[in-house]
Amino acid sequence: MSTISVRNVTKKYGAVTAIPDLSLEVTKGEFIVLVGPSGCGKSTLLRMLAGLESITEGEVAIDGEVVNNMMPRQRNIAMVFQSYALYPHMTVAGNMGFSLKLDGADKAEVAERVNEVAKILALDSLLDRKPAQLSGGQRQRVAMGRSIVRDPSVFLFDEPLSNLDAKLRVQMRAEIKSLHNRLGTTIVYVTHDQIEAMTMADRIVVMNAGTIEQVGAPLDLYDQPANLFVAEFLGSPSMNLIDGTISDSGTVVLGSGLELSLGASLRAGAEVTLGIRPEYISLSDTGGMKARCMVTVIEPTGPATILVVEMGDEKVTIEVTGRVAHKVGDFIDIWMAKEHCHLFDTSSGIRLDQ
C-alpha cells in the first residue's frame, strides 16, 4: 500500500484547461472514490496518476517519490477499466498471468500466483475458460485478478461496473470492498454513480468542472454538504432546494410565503436557498415548519414511497417509509424538520449554516 500526493496539478489540452491547480492527499490503504458528472475531470485525474496522461503543471508523488516522468509500468500501479480489456484467445489463467510472464516470471511462479488470486476471487473453477464463456461479473473479476497478481501498491478503477446490470453492480460493489478489506491496498476509484461512492469509499472526492468541491467521509458529505453542488449531487432523490430571502427580522421567507427561523445572522433581503433532504420531511406532525401542499406524483418503490408535492410555486420531493393512502390531487400537510434544514447563499452556492 502507498500514499499518493497530487500537488497543484493542472492539465491542459491546447487552450482548454481540463483540471486547474488540483491538490489531493491519499493515505496508505485508503479507498478514495472520485465522483462527479461526466466531463468533470475524474478520469483525466486517474489517468495522470497511472501515467497514461501527461501533467501540464504540478506533480504527482507516490510514497514521496515524484512520478511525473515515470512510465506507467514503473509506478507499480494496476488499473482496471470498464471494458475489461481481456484477450479473447487466452484462458482466464492466461489473462491473469500475462503481465507476470511479461515481467519474466517462470511458469511455476505464474501458476502459483494465478491459483492463489483465483481462489480469492472465486475463479479457480473457471481458469480454463475463455472470456466469451464468462458472465459480465466473471469477466470483471478476471480483470481485477490480472491486476492483483502483480501485487501493485495502488489500484486504480475507472468506472469498472458501468457495463454490468443492476444486480451484478450490487454484487461487485460488495466484492471490491471485501477485496480491499482483505488486501489493504490503496485504491482510487472513479465513478459517476453516487451509490457506488457512498457505499464503498473511506472518503469521497466530489469533482465538478475539473475542481474539487468537497472531500470527506460519505455520511459527512451527505449530512454537511459544503455547497449547493454537493448538496444536489449526493443523494437519491436529491436534496430539495427552495429559493428564499432573509426578512427584516432575520427569518427565511420562502417563495410560497412560508417563514422559517434558522438562527442565521444575514442581512435583510439576502437571497438564500433552503435545502432539506426528502427523508426529513414528514406527513405527520413531528414539529418543524408546516406547509399545505398538493400531491402531484406518487412513486411506490416497495419499502418506501416517493411523493412530489407543490408548495406554492415550488416542487418538493418527500420520501416516506412504507406506503401511503394519498392520491394525486390530494391536499396534504407536511412538516420540515428544522434541525435538518441547510441554508445556502444562492449566488455563491456556499453553505451558510456551518
What positions do the PLM features span?
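Helix-to-loop junction immediately C-terminal to a conserved catalytic motif
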Residues: 50
